[in-house]
UniProtKB/Swiss-Prot annotation:
Described purpose of this protein according to its UniProt entry: The natural substrate for this enzyme may be peptidyl-tRNAs which drop off the ribosome during protein synthesis.
Cellular component terms (Gene Ontology): cytosol
Xref: CDD domains: PTH2
Protein's organism: Methanocaldococcus jannaschii (strain ATCC 43067 / DSM 2661 / JAL-1 / JCM 10045 / NBRC 100440)
Subcellular location: Cytoplasm
UniProt xrefs under InterPro entries: Pep_tRNA_hydro_II_dom_sf, Pept_tRNA_hydro_arch, PTH2
NCBIfam families in the cross-refs: arch_pth2, PRK04322.1
Enzyme class: hydrolase
Annotated family: Belongs to the PTH2 family.
GO MF, any single term: peptidyl-tRNA hydrolase activity
GO biological process: translation
Top-rank lineage group of the source organism: Archaea
Lineage: Archaea, Methanobacteriati, Methanobacteriota, Methanomada group, Methanococci
Protein name as annotated: Peptidyl-tRNA hydrolase
Amino acid sequence: MKMVVVIRNDLGMGKGKMVAQGGHAIIEAFLDAKRKNPRAVDEWLREGQKKVVVKVNSEKELIDIYNKARSEGLPCSIIRDAGHTQLEPGTLTAVAIGPEKDEKIDKITGHLKLL
């Protein structure tokens, strides 16, 4: 069981901004998973809440990953920045998928490089 966070690397976000966007994505995906499959969430919590952070280099890649996760019925989230600091309002910044079985997520994100 794991969660994968996908961050856009093409936006020039500072490290703190990337962490914040990833945090937003994690919370939203967790809430989605809690609704869809509470037993999977409980298992993930017991196993130590494994998270992996990877990167993409475009909005298109981010949207494609999100759409694949949704089409597979996986818990997921996509984050649009509010535009208060570094980015324009509505900029897509991050996706989180899971918690779910590793192999289900790897099917979608296994080719991506670690951030």
